[in-house]
Amino acid sequence: MIKFKNLGLLEILVFLSVLYVVVMLIWTTLTREGVLEKVNSIKLNHKNVVELLNNEINKCSQSPEIKTSWGENCDSTWSSTLIVEHVLKNIELKNPYSIKTPLIQTASDPRIQAEGKAGQSTDKGVIFVSSTDFASEAGSEWIVGTCVKSPCVAAGNNELVSIYR
């Protein structure tokens, strides 16, 4: 039997450190599934928005005289605000983090918002799209970015896609 009164400060510190590591490993194991579920929901939201835009681009490249699903002419510049409003009204976005703000928003630079650079605070689960309108010229770029888990700047913790017309 170990006599606790004979344990020194170093032994107690080692014991507490080992205990802390074991508790953290157990906690990580128990919560991993919930985190993965949230991450997958956010990635699905991101994918649905990107697919909507790509489908509209493909539809409009085949028939430039028709209108987009949000009501703009295919051959004109597309309003980022109208696209965001259309997504909010017509695509079911899952909200795993109970975010109070809209799940898709415009940002001057979605990369900064999705990666959390330059001290920007980011919202996990929010899809950020370029606030500049999507120009009608061939090769015009529009960026869609999402932070899926903290820290957003870490590899694999964000989704960034450039969409071209």
Regions found by a protein language model. Name each.
Residues 44, 54-57:
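Juxtamembrane non-transmembrane segments of integral membrane proteins
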Residues 58-165:
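Periplasmic/extracellular, small/polar-rich flexible segments of pilin-like filament-forming proteins
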Residues 4-50:
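Amphipathic alpha-helical segments typified by the pilin-like N-terminal helix
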